[in-house]
A protein has these predicted regions:
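Amphipathic alpha-helical interface surfaces
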Residues: 18, 29, 36, 62, ...
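Arg/Lys-rich, positively charged N-terminal/basic patches that mediate binding to nucleic acids
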Residues: 1-35
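Enriched for short, Lys/Arg-rich terminal
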Residues: 1-13, 62-96
């Protein structure tokens, strides 16, 4: 019997590169990121996440001024970066 991959729960993993970026963020942004990732695990399509695909990567909003990036493999998301919207715009040009 084949299982439907869309019925599997979404799994989310933060890579070392993500945690390196996270540690460099101001504490208030870290707290906001924590809140957003809890929400992502509950409902990845929640409007406040702004979760969308940009080429080969997925992006999520962390407040108005920050973004996080992930790559998808099956139903798993691997978060590899988080930072300012300005840095996101520059990085997105390279990873799309």
């Amino acid at each position: 019997m084949t299982t439907n991959p869309w019925s599997d729960p979404i799994r989310s993993f933060a890579l070392r590169s993500f945690w390196d970026c996270y540690q460099a963020l101001p504490e208030h942004v870290q707290k906001l990121a924590d809140k957003q990732f809890r929400l992502f695990r509950q409902d990845p399509h929640h409007p406040s996440l702004g979760f969308s695909r940009k080429g080969e990567v997925w992006t999520a909003e962390v407040g108005g001024g920050y973004r996080a990036l992930a790559r998808q493999r099956g139903v798993d998301y691997y978060w590899f970066w988080i930072g300012s919207h300005e840095a996101y715009n520059k990085l997105l040009k390279r990873v799309k």
